From Swiss-Prot:
Protein name, per record: Fructose-1,6-bisphosphatase class 1
The protein's annotated pathway: Carbohydrate biosynthesis; gluconeogenesis
Binding site for Mg(2+) 1: E84, D103, L105
Annotated SUPFAM superfamilies: Carbohydrate phosphatase (SSF56655)
Residues that bind substrate: D106, G107, S108, S109, N196, K262
SUBUNIT field: Homotetramer.
Species, as recorded: Shewanella pealeana (strain ATCC 700345 / ANG-SQ1)
Pfam family, one: FBPase_C
Catalytic reaction(s) noted: beta-D-fructose 1,6-bisphosphate + H2O = beta-D-fructose 6-phosphate + phosphate
Length: 329
């Protein structure tokens, strides 16, 4: 099997980007080790701190954030860093070519129950001049690489450099990432959807109607049955979509009118959208393509609808309907 390093060489990417990706991959091996040891290493549980999102930080959130931050600052290829766990951007190497945005441990609410978690990352070109938050405010189309590492029964790395999506599995005996799928492809049609149904009453009318029609199955307007899946970690739900198709959505809701969106654009939605599009799927907010959004802040949140192309299109058709005369279910 081809190693990650061998695969990157075959992609003919720049040596600096190759070095950066290998640094991310090597750090994820250390994170995988920390996740596996869990309670044995005393890294489970919550701290008394909150991140910039107002979310209580888990011990592993902080540990994994520091692992990635330290590795990227020492790498020499990175100009600056933006993380879910950092209030502000972090300077790295003044001569670095890239900016890295990451969620160090997506799905951290799953940590204490020994369920799926992962690391999500996005790589952008570093513009010339002083490093500021504005340096990071680039549309997702500017990404030069993106991926995630899933810490499950196996540790897996899904990666794109704009040349399709490759899946690597960590060999625990050699500690090497080996290529196990050289061309991930999302099926255009699906019978699975992933959504947090507990928020149904807070969704916009288009999403309420769309999901209601899915639940009606063969007797409804879609005339087919759908199964629901929900892992409560974007990285796990998107991994399933990449492996066997499906639609994943965390839509707009009015549960907290000041925070109508859940997922962060720069280090969750954009990298996942890049992966999904490279695998033949689609990614939208319901009203615009995710990777076309011009960010206004590094911790900006957006609605997310992504997955099998035909099913995303079907969902978007509901968002094109005038619901002004329709009752909200």
């Amino acid at each position: 099997m081809q190693t990650l390093a061998e695969n990157l060489t075959s992609q003919a990417i720049s040596p600096t980007l190759e070095k950066l990706i290998l640094t991310l991959a090597n750090t994820s091996k250390e994170i995988s080790h920390a996740v596996r040891h869990g309670a044995l290493a005393g890294v489970l549980g919550a701290t008394e701190q909150e991140n910039v999102q107002g979310e209580t930080q888990k011990k592993l959130d902080i540990i994994t954030n520091d692992m990635l931050k330290d590795a990227l600052k020492a790498d020499g290829t990175v100009r600056g860093i933006a993380s879910e766990e950092e209030d502000y951007v972090v300077e790295a190497d003044a001569n670095g070519e890239f900016l890295v945005c990451f969620d160090p441990l997506d799905g951290s609410s799953n940590i204490d129950i020994n369920s799926l978690v992962g690391t999500i990352f996005s790589v952008l070109p570093a513009p010339a001049g002083e490093l500021t938050e504005k340096s990071f405010l680039q549309a997702g189309r500017n990404q030069v690489a993106a991926g995630y590492v899933l810490y499950g029964p196996s540790t897996m790395l899904a990666l794109t450099t704009g040349q399709g999506v490759q899946l690597f599995t960590l060999n625990p005996e050699t500690n090497e990432f080996l290529l196990t799928n050289g061309a991930m492809a999302i099926s255009k049609d699906t019978g699975e959807f992933a959504i947090n149904m507990s928020n149904q009453r807070f969704w916009e009318a288009p999403m309420q109607t769309y999901i209601s029609d899915l639940l009606l199955g063969k007797i409804g307007p879609r005339e087919k049955s759908f199964n629901m899946r929900w892992i409560a970690a974007m990285v796990g739900d998107v991994h399933r979509v990449l492996c066997r198709g499906g639609i994943f959505t965390y839509p707009t809701d009015n549960k907290n009118p000041e925070k109508p969106y859940k997922l962060r654009l720069m280090y969750e939605a954009n990298p996942m959208a890049f992966l999904v599009e490279q695998a033949g799927g689609k990614a939208s907010t319901g009203y615009e393509t995710i990777m076309d959004i011009q960010p206004t802040e590094i911790h900006q949140r957006v609605a997310v609808i992504l997955g099998s192309a035909n099913e995303v299109d079907a969902c978007l058709e509901y968002h094109g309907i005038d619901y002004s005369e329709e009752p909200v279910l």
